[in-house]
A protein has these predicted regions:
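Coil residues (strongly favoring Ser/Thr
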Residues: 27-28, 38-39, 46-47, 52-53, ...
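N-terminal periplasmic "start-of-domain" segments of outer-membrane beta-barrel proteins
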Residues: 31-89
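Extracytoplasmic beta-strand/coil segments of soluble accessory domains associated
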Residues: 57-59, 66-70, 95-136
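Short acidic/polar hinge/loop motifs at secondary-structure boundaries
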Residues: 105, 135-162
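Exposed, low-structure sequence patches enriched in small/polar residues
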Residues: 143, 305-333, 352-689
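A beta-strand signature from Gram-negative outer-membrane beta-barrel systems
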Residues: 149-195, 205
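Transmembrane beta-barrel wall of Gram-negative outer-membrane proteins
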Residues: 204-228, 235-268, 298-315
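Flexible loop and strand-edge segments within Gram-negative outer membrane beta-barrel domains
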Residues: 256-309, 313-314, 329-355, 396, ...
């Protein structure tokens, strides 16, 4: 890894030599999902299709393939997060991008590669559907997804679906859905793009994209990336390799065939948090670690394969069609005390496998006054899971639709939608409505409500249920389908120098399956293995203010979320409030050859319930934690970062970040301390071959 980064640094130096003047540069400080206006009045361009400033080359015109049908089509309120909105910002993975989105929070475990839980609306593992190009990419038996495995540089746009409609689009009826759309249009010449960064503890990231037209109708692309970090604490190292391939073929102006393949391989050491000899604050000395447990001897291996064949067609007038065939397989190997070196640590050697074959068909019919969107999904999954001591099969068939009335003025656009889901032999449903529109050219609104049922997953069906509280271990009941109600209302405003959004949501889930830890042996004296599930009711409501302001060459961005429900009502651990913001100075220097952006990033996080994770199953446990540790509420925290980036000729961006400038010692997840003050630098460089 060090040799690779040394070579990359040589490449960075050559950027300064070969840079050429470019008069039209892009400001990418637009807040994700909300339009800002920079007083510099520059155009927003995609760095992969930008024209050469010295010549107007026809070869730079992109190949125009049929675009992917967005889930939020004909939606004038919820905006996509475009890649060029964050490509020059400071991010390691998509969790850093989501930080500035309404009701979003990352349960950060403090080190690169650790399986952080990304939360939306106070919901995380088991409640969020990640949809890539129309296909659910969640682990089918865990019903979760680790964002470290996604290739960030292939993203074209992201849509965070309102909580009222999250159940609608995939094979799982999860309350929250995030749709990630890949890029399809590229310049008609070969391109190479490099992004890398390096930081303390030998943390490094290298990503290379190569894309080339073979003919006017055929494009091929290849992406390879490597991420790694050495152990900051004993047994906390991580390395990941990703390989992605893409083929786009234009059968005609009205029909395309797109094939994509994604592979990832991860090796992750699970160190279990900080032991007492690393803690400087005596308040944490109640965490009892024995000397023999300093190295937990836990690690996780993952291999993931995903292939997707997509046919996009505009053959029938007024109808856009999307037919996808997909295959997903995941191999997870979980090891704990494999060699039985420690008598007081249970030996766990589990191989958990699954594979899924499926198809998805979508028709979007659009006329002048009406839009009708229909989606049908079918998939079959086979499981071989040592952790559940179970080999089984799961079939899912879903049919959903949305009917929307369109008007010329866009002042009032009502819609109704519904879904039927035959999930492994059980029929569940969901339906709702929404109204959106524009009050004038500067203000728009949204209102949505829904009722839907959520499935019981393969994992939940293989655990005992104890529905009473306090838990009666003699009373066992079958898992119940949870009943969910959701509402969301928002106002968006957009003026010359001020823009923002105010959003309120209310969510209720009855009979929700919640994991419980109870009298379970473990490796670190922190209970981190699920014993059974219990039924709980979840009540959550909150308000978000996403506010942006431009003054001279200063840009202000703030994302404030506040939850009205108590910590116990929310059930899952999440902060009472969060504030994430940026203050940047931007300017063009050196005859517009350098675009400078510099300032601060800050995050204020309120306290939350104590909790632990079962990493093998991707479950958060807040109830019945071990009595051997005196758990208290996770305290509030504040982190301040310094950030500076310079974009040269719109071809290369060099960035430097000083993280945790105040060198604050804190944690978000007990007891995974965040990194101390560290320096991180890198470059993103676009080449034309």
């Amino acid at each position: 890894m060090k040799k690779i980064l040394l070579i990359v640094q040589v490449f960075v130096f050559s950027i300064m030599i070969y840079a050429r003047p470019l008069t039209n540069c892009a400001d990418t400080l637009i807040n994700k999902g909300i339009n800002n206006y920079d007083t510099l009045k520059v155009a927003h361009l995609d760095s992969l299709v930008i024209n050469d400033s010295t010549k107007n080359r026809v070869t730079n015109v992109p190949n125009i393939f049929i675009p992917f049908i967005e889930l939020s089509a004909k939606n004038n309120y919820h905006e996509r997060i475009k890649k060029n909105n964050f490509s020059k910002d400071d991010y390691r993975n998509l969790s850093d991008v989501f930080t500035y989105e309404p009701f979003s929070f990352n349960q950060d475990l403090g080190s690169l590669g650790q399986p952080n839980e990304q939360m939306f609306y106070g919901l995380g593992f088991g409640n969020v559907s990640y949809i890539s190009d129309g296909v659910l990419i969640n682990n089918r038996w865990q019903n979760s997804y680790n964002l470290n495995r996604y290739s960030n540089e292939l993203v074209d746009s992201i849509e965070i679906i309102p909580i009222t409609k999250g159940f609608l689009y995939s094979t799982y009826n999860n309350p929250v859905a995030v749709s990630i759309n890949s890029r399809f249009n590229y310049p008609m010449r070969a391109i190479t793009k490099l992004r890398f960064f390096q930081a303390s503890y030998d943390e490094g990231f290298v990503d290379v994209i190569f894309h080339s037209p073979i003919t006017k109708k055929l494009n091929v692309g290849l992406n390879i990336s490597n991420t790694a970090i050495d152990s900051r604490f004993a047994n906390s190292d991580y390395e990941s390799w990703k390989l992605n391939a893409q083929i786009n073929y234009q059968l005609s102006d009205k029909m395309n065939i797109d094939f994509s393949y994604h592979y990832s391989n991860d090796t992750l050491a699970l160190f279990g948090g900080l032991d007492t000899n690393k803690m400087l604050n005596g308040n944490y000395s109640t965490v009892l670690y024995e000397t023999i447990n300093k190295k937990s001897a836990r690690y996780l291996l993952n291999n993931n394969n995903q292939a997707n064949l997509k046919i996009l067609a505009f053959v029938i007038p007024n109808i856009k069609s999307d037919l996808s065939f997909y295959f997903i397989s995941t191999s997870q190997k979980y090891f704990q005390n494999e060699g039985q070196l420690f008598e007081n640590i249970p030996r766990i050697v589990h191989g958990n496998y699954y594979q899924t074959f499926g198809m998805s068909f979508r028709n979007l019919y659009e006329q002048k006054y009406i839009s009708f969107d229909v989606i049908a999904n079918y998939e079959t999954s086979t499981f071989k899971t040592d952790v559940l001591n179970n080999n089984s099969k799961q079939d899912v068939f879903t049919f959903s639709g949305e009917l929307k009335y369109l008007t010329n003025s866009d002042r009032f656009i009502p819609a109704v939608y519904g879904k039927l889901n035959r999930f492994n032999g059980k029929m569940i449903y969901g339906f709702g409505f929404e109204v959106m529109g524009k009050i004038d050219n500067h203000i728009s609104y949204y209102l949505g409500m829904s009722l839907f049922q959520q499935q019981t997953t393969h994992m939940e069906n293989n655990y005992l249920y104890h529905s009473t509280f306090p838990y009666d271990l003699t009373a066992v009941s079958p898992p119940q389908i949870s009943e969910n109600r959701a509402a969301e209302v928002g106002i968006k405003f957009d003026y010359n120098f001020v823009s923002g959004k105010i959003t309120y949501f209310n969510y209720k889930s009855l009979n929700k399956a919640v994991p419980i830890g109870f009298m379970t042996k473990n490796d670190s004296l922190l209970v981190n293995e699920v014993s059974f599930f219990s039924e709980r009711n979840i009540y959550n409501s909150g308000i978000n203010l996403n506010f942006n302001f431009v003054l001279w060459k200063l840009l202000f961005n703030n994302n404030l979320s506040y939850y009205f429900s108590s910590k116990t009502e929310r059930v899952y651990a999440s902060p009472d409030y969060t504030l994430a913001g940026k203050i940047y100075y931007t300017n063009f220097l050196f005859e517009n050859n350098l675009y400078l952006k510099t300032g601060i990033n800050y995050r204020l996080t309120a306290g939350q319930l104590p909790f632990v994770y079962d990493f093998e199953k991707s479950l958060q446990i807040t109830a019945n934690l071990t009595p051997m540790v005196n758990y208290s509420e996770v305290p509030s925290s504040f982190q301040l970062d310094l950030f500076m980036s310079g974009t040269i000729q719109e071809r290369a961006t060099i960035f430097v970040t000083i993280e945790n400038v105040l060198d604050a010692e804190y944690y978000i997840v007990p007891y995974y301390f965040k990194q101390p003050m560290t320096l991180r630098f890198g470059v993103s460089w676009l080449l034309y071959d």
